[in-house]
Amino acid sequence: LAALICAGALPVPQAQAQTAGLRAFTSDQELATFLKRRARQHPAPMPADLPPPAPTMVMAPSSAPGAANEAVVVTGTRASSPSITNTQEADVDEGGIVKVHGNHLVVLRRGRLFTVRIGDGTMRAVDHVDAFPPGTNGDAWYDEMLVSGDRVIVVGYSYERGGTEINRFRIDAAGRLRYEDSYHLRSNDYYSSSNYASRLIGSQLIFYTPLDLDPYAPIVAQLPALRRWTGKDLDRYAGLGKDGFQRITPATRVYVPEPIRRNSEADISTLHTVTVCDLAAPRLSCRATAVLGSDSSNFYVSGNAVYVWIGEALPGGKGHDRAMLYRMPLDGSRPGALQAWGGPVDQFSFREDRAARALDVVVRAESRGDWMWRPEVSSGDAALLRLPLSAFGNGAYLAPGRAYRPLPLGKQPDWSFHNRFMGRHLVYSAGRFAGEQNEAAVFVVPLDGGLIGRIRAPHGVDRIDIIGNDAVVIGNDAKDRLGFSSIELAGGPPRLGDTSFLPAAREGERRSQAFFYRPDPGSPNGASGTLGLPVTRDLGKSPAARFLGSGSAVAFLRRDARRLAPAGELAAHAETARDDDCKASCVDWYGNARPIFLGDRVFALMGYELVEGKLSNGRIREYARLDFAPTATARK
C-alpha cells in the first residue's frame, strides 16, 4: 500500500467522476446475458478459504452472563424515547438487544421479547412473547431489535425459510406486546462479529445484505425480493411468484461500474443490496438498490447513504488488486462508485463529513471484510483516505496517491487493529490482542492537519470509544488487569489522561453497544460522567467468549474533571438461574449484558437479570433486582 501511495494513482478527468453515476441494466434479459457471458469468460475460482459453517443450535445456560439536501426523506416521526444504545452515528439507530419505549424497557433474549416497566421508579416484568411467527418452530436466529413508534421490530436470519426475517410486534402504553406480521428478505446470512445488520432512521428500516449469484440459474429468482408470511404454514406465503417472493429490485435498479463491466476478469459473484423498508406502512413495503462485486465487503451507514467497500474488485496482478467503493444514497437516487487500494477494517473505519461533503476511510493493505470473525485480523500498511463525495461517479475514478495519508504503526505484530473517529480526530491502535502486552501505542490523527501524536497506553487495547470530547482506550495488561485510559483530545495537543485498572477482570463483551458513557448534566463537554461496561471475572474461559458475551457483572467508572476511578459493579446472580425452556436463538451471538442509563437512573442488564443501582459519593450500590426469566409453565 505504501509503495502504491508513493507512486501515486492517476485519476480520470474529474468532470467524468462528477457528472456520471453508475449505469443500470435495461432489462432482466440484459442482466442475465451479461452474467452468463462473464461466467463463460471467467469461471469462478475455488475460494481461498471456506466460510464458517452455519451456527449449530446450542442450549446455553439460561442466564449465561451530507448536505442537507441529501438527507434521507423519512415517514413518521422519530421516537421521543431517549437513546440507550451506543451508536456510531447519533441520528442512526442500530439493531440491538435492549431498547426503551416510554416507561418500559424492551429486551430481546433467547428468541423472546420481554417488557419491563421502569417508569414508576420500580421494576416490574410486564409481558413476554416469542420473537418469531406463531405456529412456527423458531428455527432461526433472532439477533437484533429496534423500536419505531408503537412497533417493535425483530430482525433474524432463517436458514429454513431462506433469508433475513423481519417480525413486527405492536407495543401499547402498558407494555403489552402483540404479534403483527412477518416478512422475509432474500439474502445471505448477514452475521458479522462487529457490525450490525439493521439501521433505523425515523420509520425507515435499512439493511445491507449480500446475495450470492449463480449465472446459470434464472436471474429473476435471485434478485432481491420480499415475501409476507401468512400464518398458514411454513411454506405458504402471500405475494407473487411460486415461492411467494415479490421482487423489490428490477434490473433497472441493478448497477455495475464501467471498469467492472468492461473487465472480464473482475469478480461479480455477489449482488450487494441496500434495502429500505417503511415500517409505518400497514403492510411492510420495501425498495432495494443493488450493485455487482466480489464477496469481500465492509459497509457503513451514515444519515444520507450506505457505503459499501468491495475488496479485490478489479485484478491488478502482483498484489495490486483494486477495490471498488460504492455510495448508495438512502433516497433511492443513482449510486456512484470509485476505485481505491487496500480496505477498511470495520464500520468504524468510515466517517462521512457532511459539512465538507467528504468521506474519510482508514484502510490497511490487507483486510478481509465484515463477515464473521474477519474484522478481528488485518495486516500491512495503514493510511487515512479522504475522498470528496463528488468523486463518486461511474467507477472510473481511481483515488490518487495524494488522497492517502500514511499512518504509522506500532511494533510487530500489528494485526489487532482498532480505530474510531471522534470529533476532528482519528484515534487508532494496532498490536496483539489485549492481555498479551503491558503497553500499547495509541495514535491520534488531527483531521484538520498537523502532526500525528503517539501516546503510550499502560495496557493493551481492545476497545476505543468516546467519553465526552475525549477518547478512552480499554484493554488488559499481562497481569489480567483491565485498564481504562483516557486520551485527552480537547484543550491542547492530544495526551494521555488518567488511567484506572480493575484487577482480575476482562471485558465481558466486545461489541460496540456493550459500552456506554453518560456525561453528567452539568458537564456538557463530558469531563465528568459515568462509564459502564460488562466484565467477566472468569479468566479461564476461552478467548472466543468475549466475542459472544461472557459478562458476569457490569462495571462502572466515575469520571470527575477528567479523573477516572472505579465506582463498583452490579453483578449477576448466576446461581439463581432456572430453565427458560429456550426454543430458538439459544446462543448469545450479540452478547447478553448492557449498561443502561435513563435519566438519573442506572441499570445493568445481565441475561434475565435487570439490576438497578444508585450512585452516591462516586460509588454504585445495588438498589433493586428483577429476574424476568420465563418458566416452562408461564411460557406463552
Task: Provide a role label for each language-model segment.
Residues 5-14:
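C-terminal segment of classical bacterial N-terminal signal peptides
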Residues 15-636:
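Beta-sheet-rich non-transmembrane sensory/scaffold domains
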